[in-house]
């Protein structure tokens, strides 16, 4: 195992942070895989937290916002993704209290319904249900979305 200096380890962590935000857990994993000693990694990460360059709560907010805009997912899946990325469960729970899964489900449903345009209604409903379930939305929210889309005539049909 290579013997790395604190400055070298900090430079590597800062390089990773310059590319995108990371949780403390993600950075630790990448640094350990790179060959840095655990004690050195912890020391560097403590320093970066102290300097507010690593903030798991800010990272989680950024991830939630990004996913909500780009690829909406259900509350359960979002919580799973946050925890998988190393965000402490208490932070994930607190941030997801206000998570509007119904509106995100509807937005994802509108996009998918547009992609399914031209198919018969029952096939579109089934494919939409599977798509939304795979995105982690709960059945009551999926049912409401499908009803809303097909009751008013899918918005995608008017495009």
Curated annotation (Swiss-Prot):
The organism of origin for this protein: Chlorobium limicola (strain DSM 245 / NBRC 103803 / 6330)
Cellular component GO terms, alphabetical: cytoplasm
PANTHER family, A to Z: REGULATORY PROTEIN RECX FAMILY PROTEIN
Matching Pfam families: RecX_HTH1, RecX_HTH2
Function summary: Modulates RecA activity.
Keyword Protease: no
UniProt keyword Cytoplasm present: yes
Keywords for the protein's UniProt record, in alphabetical order: Cytoplasm
Stated name of the protein: Regulatory protein RecX
């Amino acid at each position: 195992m290579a013997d790395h200096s604190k400055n070298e380890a900090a430079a590597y962590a800062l390089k990773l942070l310059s590319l995108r935000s990371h949780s403390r857990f993600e950075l630790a994993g990448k640094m350990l895989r790179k060959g840095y000693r655990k004690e050195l990694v912890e020391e560097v990460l403590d320093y970066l937290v102290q300097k507010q360059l690593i903030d798991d709560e800010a990272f989680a907010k950024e991830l939630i916002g990004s996913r909500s805009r780009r690829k909406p997912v259900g509350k359960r899946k979002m919580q799973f993704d946050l925890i998988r990325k190393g965000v402490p469960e208490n932070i994930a729970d607190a941030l997801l209290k206000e998570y509007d899964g119904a509106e995100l489900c509807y937005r994802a449903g509108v996009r998918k319904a547009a992609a399914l345009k031209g198919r018969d209604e029952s096939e579109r409903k089934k494919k939409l249900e599977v798509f939304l379930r795979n995105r982690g939305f709960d059945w009551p929210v999926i049912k409401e979305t499908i009803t809303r889309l097909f009751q008013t005539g899918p918005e995608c049909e008017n495009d």
